[in-house]
Amino acid sequence: MTIQLINESSNTEKFQQICDKWRLVHDRSAILALVLTDERLELRKLDEPKLGAIAVNFVDGTMAHRRKFGGGRGEAVAKAVGIKGDYLPTIIDATAGLGRDAFVLASVGCKVLLVERNPIVAALLEDGLVRAYADPEIGAFMQERMILADVRDISLLDVAQQAADVVYLDPMYPHKQKSALVKKEMRVFQHLVGADLDSDNFFVPAKALARKRVVVKRPDYAPFLAEQKPDFSQTTKNHRFDVYLSHLKSA
């Protein structure tokens, strides 16, 4: 993936550390840019400046509103992973993206290990986590419940040491709509990472790591992951959560 690397901050050393850690190489011809400002790390689509920048922000804005006034345990993702009563499963979010579903789960009390294989997305996610860790309101529970894994692929996790109750998968899937109708964030993301065409390969390592269930979020029109029929599904207006119970145990 080609990207421009732009430092608009006063901290040149921090910018270089980010580039080195994620092995990012500047390409002046790229239309996507990863930009460090004094406030945050953000992604811009230079040929569509009206789209604005994409950054990870758990502290305020949409995500803070969702934490305070959203459905909490009643949200579809919370029901899909099996949250009930005092039961708060440990979770591996194997396709973490910008961490939004993971944040919902962490906000209601689950511990979530985040895995993200795209280095640019992982850099954005880490930046958002670092800022959240420093926040006086949510910092303590974020440090305890949302951790970015050192590995970029769930197949590299140690089944004996890092298994979780639930493995959650939300692979990118092509949108049916024309790009102009897809919200800005998804348009930029599709340009950055494309569809997860190899997402079927997630299924086997996910089953190995999940003690209770694997949950796969899909658009309502998408086929089952790896052509595997789930034990049951939960549906929302536009999506479907396919649930696979581990080793035929009750979840």
UniProtKB/Swiss-Prot annotation:
Its main location: cytoplasm. Pfam families: SAM_MT. The keyword rRNA processing applies. SUPFAM superfamilies: S-adenosyl-L-methionine-dependent methyltransferases. Keywords: Cytoplasm, Methyltransferase, rRNA processing, S-adenosyl-L-methionine, Transferase. It catalyses: guanosine(1516) in 16S rRNA + S-adenosyl-L-methionine = N(2)-methylguanosine(1516) in 16S rRNA + S-adenosyl-L-homocysteine + H(+). S-adenosyl-L-methionine binds at R100, D101, E116, R117, D170. Belongs to the methyltransferase superfamily. RsmJ family. This is Ribosomal RNA small subunit methyltransferase J. It comes from Actinobacillus pleuropneumoniae serotype 3 (strain JL03). The gene is rsmJ.
